[in-house]
Amino acid sequence: MQKNYKAKYVIQNSETILENFFIEITDNIITNLTNEAVNDSEVIDLGNVAIMPGFVNAHTHVGLVSVKGLGHSTASALYDVMWGIEPHLNEDDVIKLSKLGILDCLSSGTTSINDHYFFSEGVATAAIEMGIRGFIGHTVMTEYGPWLGDDQISM
């Protein structure tokens, strides 16, 4: 499916700002950038907005979203709260927490994350389902987390 989105500004980089441009998207891929709508596809006028590339967060733990904002002046949120909870987490819990963390990322314009957390396959599942680009690594800890045994090391 092809659509054209019209925006007041399209910011390509720090030096190139286009005014009153159309972004053609076909099957969720940007296929054209032009100053007039192409083809007979649907035009969606976004009004007085700026469209720009998404942000990349190169160090996330999206599954830790539940302690966001707690204990910023100390590490107590991590040590006292999450390290008490994490040994009891399962993959389904991590998927749900990761989806919430990814929603937080997307709502602030972050479209790519580099994340590592327990149950990395669950984090990857959440990333795919939420539509964010993810570079996902696995966390291995013998204390405080859900240690699944030596099989974790061979992943």
What feature does the model see in each segment?
Residues H61, F118-F119, T139-Y144:
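Active-site beta-loop-alpha junctions enriched in small/polar residues
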Residues D92-I102, Y117-S120, Q152-I153:
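Short, acidic/polar
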Residues K8, I23, N28, N48, ...:
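Divalent metal-coordination and catalytic microenvironments
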